[in-house]
Amino acid sequence: MHYSQMRWMFFCLTALLHGSFIVNAAKILVYCPSISKSHVLLCSKYADLLHNAGHDTVLFIPSYSKLLDNYDGAKHAKVWRLHNVTEAYDTKLGTLANVMENSHIGFIDRLTFDADFWIDMCADLLGKLPEMQHIIDYKFDLVIYNEIDPCTPAIVRLFNIPKTVLLSSEAIMDKVAWNLGLPTLPSYVPSVEENPNHDRMSFFERMSNVYKFFQSIVVHYLQDIHVLNLFRKEVSSDFPSIAEIIRNVSLVLVNTDEIFDLPRSYSSKFVYVGMLEAGKDENVTLPKKQDDYFKKGKSGSVFVSFGTVTPFRSLPERIQLSILNAIQKLPDYHFVVKTTADDESSAQFFSTVQNVDLVDWVPQKAVLRHANLKLFVSHGGMNSVLETMYYGVPMVIMPVFTDQFRNGRNVERRGAGKMVLRETVVKETFFDAIHSVLEEKSYSSSVKRISHLMKNKPFTSEERVTKWIDFVLKYETSEHFDLESNNLSIIEHNHLDLFFYLCIISLLNFVVYRKIFKRKSQS
């Protein structure tokens, strides 16, 4: 074959393959308010994954927190921002110390907190709608959004994007299960938010779990009513309810791992994803200075980090003192405490302690892979927990918000560590928990077993996401995935009509037989 003919065939083949790639590519929007650094990082992983799978992917970040205005986490996907959305978020974060001192967030407090926290931001965001016209004009094929902010489903609805996918950054939320008709039995399924229960509950724990589930459903229902009223006032009088919007999603991606999470019933619309980028960045190592920190300690090192939302200086004094006491009573272990670069108060607090160093940032996966790391003391955020389980490191968890309580109890349930509740913390609390996990070998063996199972699952997290996204882009799945319970009333769903019918029949039978026996006795 002549050289020019070969070159022409090669050109045609390349064009054909390139054309096929273009046909299969879709425009995908990942909608991600800057609620926290970990939240934005999670969205970024999904955006990058779908970009690398050949899609035209955009990560859109409405700025809720000015602290994150320069952070997106995306390495490959395009990033669009909407700046100066609201000041309500950062203002509310200023009250974090008060929240940390609360033993429990009560029903009325929860209503007030959520109303102040989310609804004000929703009104601010809706006022920025004209600045989001370019999203509508781009004509996306699919959008992925998170369920945390109650305003998000309503805003996304205005973009007129044909396919929607819900990203649950936690375990399956109570409100999501409720809206999608998923059976949730509080007898063994722990409510997700502010609930330190697992699936094996005592009588009083079940009572508490029923209350937590009821509180969660009512609070989110009232949130949704506030959002709906706002949109019906500002957008359209026939704007659909938030429940209806969520009910019409094509898929729910759940950011937890079935190996770690507690078993529960779910439908085909739910896909457990687990830890994205597992095993990636294995070549990333700690900077020498930080590596030297973790090499210290005769018996090993302990990493202490309560996440970006809860720096060490924001902890109540009694909790700081309890952690200090544990560090001082475990001199053979070296502690590395994560705080912020400008945190002079924590530097002063630990100034006389020999076995502690402070860091403002570390590559967490590199820390968890460190050969000398023996324990991670954490707030229990889902991303941190999944990474720690994957790398086989025991944990001590002090939860702060929402699902972190459930995550901490799951760690205990799996034998991978201990949880301490902030309202119970006294001087010896952290020492008792840390010392126990470090000295009892069962914790290390349990978490290593979990790590082995997570690393050897049949399908990777990346495969699950990309294949399911491609599937829902290509096909309409509602007929096959939607539970009929979506169309049932509360009365039908809980058989209340059947129960009432049986009661009436039983009562009529009782009356009839009573009259028959009465007549017989008289005769």
UniProtKB/Swiss-Prot annotation:
<dbReference type="GO" id="GO:0015020">
    <property type="term" value="F:glucuronosyltransferase activity"/>
</dbReference>
<keyword id="KW-0325">Glycoprotein</keyword>
<keyword id="KW-0732">Signal</keyword>
<feature type="transmembrane region" description="Helical">
    <location>
        <begin position="490"/>
        <end position="508"/>
    </location>
</feature>
<keyword id="KW-0328">Glycosyltransferase</keyword>
<keyword id="KW-0472">Membrane</keyword>
<feature type="signal peptide">
    <location>
        <begin position="1"/>
        <end position="25"/>
    </location>
</feature>
<feature type="glycosylation site" description="N-linked (GlcNAc...) asparagine">
    <location>
        <position position="487"/>
    </location>
</feature>
<dbReference type="InterPro" id="IPR002213">
    <property type="entry name" value="UDP_glucos_trans"/>
</dbReference>
<comment type="similarity">
    <text>Belongs to the UDP-glycosyltransferase family.</text>
</comment>
<protein>
    <recommendedName>
        <fullName>Putative UDP-glucuronosyltransferase ugt-50</fullName>
        <ecNumber>2.4.1.17</ecNumber>
    </recommendedName>
</protein>
<feature type="glycosylation site" description="N-linked (GlcNAc...) asparagine">
    <location>
        <position position="283"/>
    </location>
</feature>
<dbReference type="GO" id="GO:0016020">
    <property type="term" value="C:membrane"/>
</dbReference>
<feature type="glycosylation site" description="N-linked (GlcNAc...) asparagine">
    <location>
        <position position="248"/>
    </location>
</feature>
<dbReference type="InterPro" id="IPR050271">
    <property type="entry name" value="UDP-glycosyltransferase"/>
</dbReference>
<feature type="glycosylation site" description="N-linked (GlcNAc...) asparagine">
    <location>
        <position position="84"/>
    </location>
</feature>
<keyword id="KW-0808">Transferase</keyword>
<keyword id="KW-1133">Transmembrane helix</keyword>
<dbReference type="GO" id="GO:0008194">
    <property type="term" value="F:UDP-glycosyltransferase activity"/>
</dbReference>
<keyword id="KW-0812">Transmembrane</keyword>
<dbReference type="Pfam" id="PF00201">
    <property type="entry name" value="UDPGT"/>
</dbReference>
<dbReference type="InterPro" id="IPR035595">
    <property type="entry name" value="UDP_glycos_trans_CS"/>
</dbReference>
